[in-house]
UniProtKB/Swiss-Prot annotation:
GO terms for cellular component: acetyl-CoA carboxylase complex. The keyword Zinc-finger applies. This is Acetyl-coenzyme A carboxylase carboxyl transferase subunit beta. It holds the Pfam family Zn_ribbon_ACC. PANTHER family: ACETYL-COENZYME A CARBOXYLASE CARBOXYL TRANSFERASE SUBUNIT BETA, CHLOROPLASTIC. It is found in: Cytoplasm. It comes from Limosilactobacillus reuteri subsp. reuteri (strain JCM 1112). Zn(2+) binds at C40, C43, C58, C61. It catalyses: N(6)-carboxybiotinyl-L-lysyl-[protein] + acetyl-CoA = N(6)-biotinyl-L-lysyl-[protein] + malonyl-CoA.
Length: 289
């Protein structure tokens, strides 16, 4: 086939990529939208983004992709009234660039920090809801996050409501130092007061739930659920291996392995969560009458 005036010659006489080919390749790349194709972190299946349902679940292995809090909210509940959306961190350690990073993420996520809290309902079952957002500094636990979750439990205790909390976190936020770690104890105390009032607390562990969140309120629930293949643990895999100087099993920190050892009550697919939560909330409310 003869080469036309506008055709692209892939290689020159020296068998190297031609300048015209590089330009054409760049133009083609610019026409492909970002996130058009995704690779499942668990089974490594290549996924066409437009074929994913609203639940953002891998059709091959049921792994739930990491999604923003408001995305989860859109299919989880029937109504929602947001709490404490104006709370702001004061950058207590004056960490360089931290305030700018927070401001940028606030614009992107429409959240003031890494958790969305409020009063929600599913089929007339009213409850207090918290959803941690892995797109906001990996759902890390800072002072505002801890304060919002604490206030959520205090509201639930006062109004005698169950609490449902979706966890997704890399742990305590390093930019806030010891003040971040203090949130673990503060939230746990609010949970203790909620439990003392005889009220139900349901946790749903999503990918990833690690660090100080796992070491505190993620494991304090009366009922602990988890999404398929969610990473759940305290220290990261590399930290563990560097500490004990040996490899750990690939599934050691998987939700399935933790279920096997009795720390999780049930693995629930994302598309089944709303129905299961409705049943649990209804059962809990009857038991509490």
């Amino acid at each position: 086939m003869e080469e036309g005036a506008d055709s692209v010659k892939l290689y020159d006489q020296n068998n190297t990529l031609s300048e015209r080919h590089i330009k054409a390749d760049k133009n083609a790349d610019e026409r492909v939208p970002d996130q058009m194709w995704l690779r499942c972190p668990h089974c490594h299946q290549l996924l066409f983004a437009k074929q994913l349902t609203q639940y953002a679940v891998c059709p091959n292995c049921d792994y739930g992709l990491r999604i923003p809090a408001r995305h989860r909210l859109s299919w989880l509940v029937d109504s929602f009234k947001e709490f404490d959306k104006d709370l702001q961190t004061k950058n207590p350690l004056h960490f360089p660039g931290y305030q700018e990073k927070i401001s940028k993420l606030q614009r992107q996520t429409k959240l003031n920090d890494s958790v969305l809290t409020g009063e929600a309902s599913i089929n007339d079952q009213l409850f207090s809801l918290g959803i941690m957002d892995p797109t906001f500094i990996m759902g890390s636990l800072g002072t505002v996050t801890g304060e919002k979750i604490t206030r959520l439990f205090e509201y639930a205790t006062t109004h005698r409501q169950a609490v449902v909390l979706f966890t997704a976190s890399g742990g305590a936020r390093m930019q806030e130092g010891i003040m971040s770690l203090m949130q673990m104890a503060k939230v746990s105390q609010a949970i203790n007061e909620h439990a003392a009032a005889g009220l139900l607390y349901i946790v749903v562990l999503t990918d990833p739930t690690t660090g100080g969140v796992t070491a505190s309120f993620a494991m304090d629930g009366d009922i602990i659920l988890a999404e398929p293949h969610a990473l759940v643990g305290f220290a990261g895999r590399r930290v563990i291996e560097q500490t004990i100087h040996q490899q750990i099993p690939i599934d050691l920190q998987s939700a399935e392995n933790i279920l096997h050892h009795g720390f999780i009550d049930r693995i629930v697919k994302r598309q089944d969560e709303k129905k299961l939560l409705e049943w649990l909330l209804k059962t809990g409310s009857v038991a509490n009458e």
